[in-house]
Swiss-Prot record:
Protein name (database record): NADH-quinone oxidoreductase subunit B
Record Gene3D superfamilies: 3.40.50.12280
Matching InterPro entries: NADH_UbQ_OxRdtase-like_20kDa, NADH_UQ_OxRdtase_20Kd_su
GO terms of molecular function: 4 iron, 4 sulfur cluster binding; iron ion binding; NADH dehydrogenase (ubiquinone) activity; NADH:ubiquinone reductase (non-electrogenic) activity; quinone binding
Enzyme Commission code(s) on record: 7.1.1.-
Binding note for cofactor: Binds 1 [4Fe-4S] cluster.
Gene: nuoB
Organism listed in the record: Nitratidesulfovibrio vulgaris (strain DSM 19637 / Miyazaki F) (Desulfovibrio vulgaris)
HAMAP family: NDH1_NuoB
Entry binding sites for [4Fe-4S] cluster: 51-52, 117, 149
EC category name: translocase
Gene Ontology BP annotations: aerobic respiration; electron transport coupled proton transport
GO cellular component terms attached to this protein's record: plasma membrane; respiratory chain complex I
Catalysed reactions listed for this entry: a quinone + NADH + 5 H(+)(in) = a quinol + NAD(+) + 4 H(+)(out)
Length: 187
């Protein structure tokens, strides 16, 4: 029997009532589970350009242990990452590489600007300078800003918590007392 002789059954789909295509499956609960899984298993890509990269390395050590909060392995490849941590001064010569790496990351992707240099150019941002990008947000969309020169490892962890909050819509870890006072009472 040839392939053209086989009867093809039309798909059995019930027409939607009211002229609106009703969803077949409610994926909202599944999406919530996926968001929690995504938030608790972020794979950061380090883009350490200056002093702040040292603090980023400290977060991976035993005292702070970023793996407790779901960001265990710093990935060397943008195709394996969903969080880019830009730490340090971004020069105009480095800007195209940063944008290219961001574009190679799979969606959804998140960016954290770590330190004053990544946020605004830091002490290198002065009148007449030509080599420094005045904030990484001029190149790629930034989700969380972590200020400091350099920021403490605890601040980087708080930035990670903010990204997790952005993904899931809820706070998973308590706000430390020294941070909650500066945030206006806690989350």
């Amino acid at each position: 029997m040839a392939a053209q002789d086989c009867p093809v059954r039309p798909p059995v789909i019930a027409p939607a009532t009211g002229g609106v295509d009703a969803p077949i499956v409610n994926v909202a609960p599944v999406q919530k589970i996926l968001d929690v899984c995504r938030a608790m298993s972020l794979w950061p890509m380090t883009f350490g350009l200056a002093c702040c990269a040292i603090e980023m390395m400290a977060v991976g050590m035993a005292r702070f242990d970023i793996s407790r909060f779901g960001a265990e392995v710093f990935r060397p490849s943008p195709r394996q990452s969903d969080l880019m941590i830009v730490a340090g001064t971004v020069t105009r010569k480095m800007a195209p590489a940063l944008v290219r790496l961001y574009e190679q990351m799979p969606a959804p992707r998140y960016v954290m600007a770590l330190g004053n240099c990544a946020i605004s150019g830091g002490p290198f941002n002065f009148e007449g300078q030509y080599a420094i990008v005045e904030g990484v947000d001029n190149l790629v969309p930034v989700d969380v800003y972590v200020p400091g020169c350099p920021p403490r490892p605890e601040a980087l962890l708080e930035g990670l918590f903010q990204i997790q909050h952005k993904i899931t819509g809820r706070r998973w870890w308590p706000v430390p007392a020294e941070i909650s006072g500066s945030m206006g009472g806690g989350a």
